[in-house]
Amino acid sequence: MINVGWSVNEAVAAGVGFGHTLAGADVVVTMKIPGLYQSGDIFTSASYFHDKRGALIYYIASDFTPSSTQHVIDPRYLFKTCMVPVIEPRTHQEMMDAPGLAAEIGRKYKTPVVILASGGLCHSEGLVRLNEIKKRELMDIPEDLARFNLLPSMARENYDAVMDERMPGLEDLVENTPLIKWEQDGGKRGVITCGVTTAYVKEVRDFYNVDMDILSLHMTNPVPIKKIIEFYDSIDGDVYVIEDGYMYLQEAMEREGMKVIGKEKYSKITEWSPTLIAEKLGFDIEHKPSSVKPVPRPPMICAGCPYTLFGGVIAKMKKRGKIEAIFGDIGCNALLYFMNALETGLAMGASDSQRQGFVIARPDKAAKCISIIGDGTECHSGMDATRNAVFRKVPGVKVVLDNYWTAMTGGQPSPSSPVNLAGDELDFDLVKALEGNGCRVLVASSYDKKEIQKTMKEALSIAENNEFVVVVVRGCCVKKQPPKSKGIRLKINKEKCEKCYTCLMCSGIEKGEDGFPQYNNLCSGCAGENPACLQMCPFDAIEFLDESDKKTAAAASFAEPPELVLPGFSNADFPERLTLAIRGVGGQGNLFFGKVLTQLAFIAGYSKDNIVKGETHGMAQMGGPVISTFSCGKVHSPVLFPQSADCLITMEVSELLRPGYLELLREGATILISKTKVIPPVITTEEYPSQEDIAKAVEGFKVVEVDVLAKAMEIGDSTGKIANVVMIGTLSKLPPFDTIPTELWLQAVKNVSPKPAIWAGNYAAFMAGREMV
């Protein structure tokens, strides 16, 4: 049986994992790069134990863009120092197989094992084939647990034993593993690579149909230097090193006297793409710069987020000089930066420790600055700083925004949630925990502007008296509220509206073509709470709808679809490969689009070759620019190569202006454009690209324009959520995608959302989309 659970932070998870191994069990501890460093003491300390135990496997997601973290630091140098083997999966299949292999290595060589998964794989999905289920018996509990102690003399002994036993064995393993892939092709030019960049290199090779020997490493610590030298000596021409991160492999080769072409000194490349690799190999890539700048889209908190009112209040206090410095943290609260309600951001749990240092250095600023942190991060590592403020008697104000869940990463539970991952009710009480640490605590409702203002005023007054106080602002994450509680409940009274645009702090409201604010399909109605925009409007221009006019997600009703009967078909009648990219704004349903296409590829028989899709994750999903890619058939990479896409889909019209996007389209293929406009609050309507700008950008391309949002609303969905399904229907009519029978498309849509009510709406949307071309 596999036991899965969330720990409060990565250091605790690593300790829990180590405890599992002492009980004889194999364990996988997952984290991103920041989590590695947060757990660094346990990671490094545990790396040198060399007695038999269960396998300790660290599954660590890198992010060399970065898109979801703040780190572009290459951790392989740390792994090398810790003498732990490192597996870098090249495909999704290898990523799935890696834990089993790691467990075998961990048990045999009595070592922790790192699976370093690249951001390119973690932010994509690919075809995998399931293996036979294997069961490993628990190892015997070590007779002498005293061996697992790190007294200085024992640490020395452990290090020496690792050098004598573990490392020679691991070096033999990496040099002789069949998982090193050497693809010979004439020896004129060679590429050494590892991880997901292997797929990118193959994409370039196949596109240009060039001779290229490839040595693809599966394990990068220890470095299989003998195999690398053998490969290097077999190449008559240049040898290239393509690796994400820093120059780890490149430096290892150069130390051995090999002359390779890799990254230049002070290179800014931390993550390769097929385009960058092609250019590195000497191929010319035609770039088509646009004269029109893309629309700036800073990520926003969700429409109706309980943090909205607090952000508005703090931004105003900052503007008026009542607050001079705001120290922020990691999580949804970081998005308050784009509301001018937060300034610094350093690391998980570090907001109040920054504030404390600032106040200790400038005691006169104790009542002029605040720190902000989320409840999940406070439980993760922020409470250490809370205790430090009490311990060191540092006056000031710490704000904990408590939405009960770890919202930014998907709504996982934390100790402050109602339940844990297993659904068990929790006894932890955040306010009592803070009080138990010796804090004075004030509580305010996140949907009550006046209460927030009053509470913050009181908190700053307490700070003026040289005391420390914690303000807890409480309101449930809007994503966790029941769907029936959501929907547009308000309207703009244009006679009262002065177009001050204070309400545009929420992504559920946008500037209309007439200049007046208007509610859009993202509006959640603050999930039945007192709406933030209503409270923020200084002119009372926002009013509740009459009962008869209320629009809710539950209002739509669709006829029952006919029963699906799949026709006979041959995969040989379909294109050898299909590739497309979808651009839009976070929240428009790109992820659903990709799921449908994946199901379609399975039904159409493309699983005999490969299916991959890539997606933007992280803060960009919160109203920022997002891109999804999909490929099936004879394909390798989740990142597309220029001139390879059979179609480009743009769910928000201006998003086609993003650099490099139009270059992805192959000659003669189609750009499918939604007429939807989402104007971010950081620009005016006049600054948004004109229709002439868009037309000029796509001049010379084959273009199909459709208003899928209007069509979705026309057929009965006032939320516009099925606009992406309308677009899928339109896509199904365009070549080469029209070679796949309509019934297969419909079955794919149904497979993703089979609930009768949802399927009925999606069926209507799909068929409506087909009628638009």
Identify the meaning behind each predicted range.
Residues 35-38, 548, 555-773:
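Active-site cofactor/cluster-binding pocket
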Residues 64-118, 145, 150, 154, ...:
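Conserved thiamine diphosphate
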Residues 287-394, 436, 554-574:
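Cofactor-binding active-site loop characterized by glycine-rich and histidine/acidic residues
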Residues 68, 335-472, 482-483:
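Thiamine diphosphate
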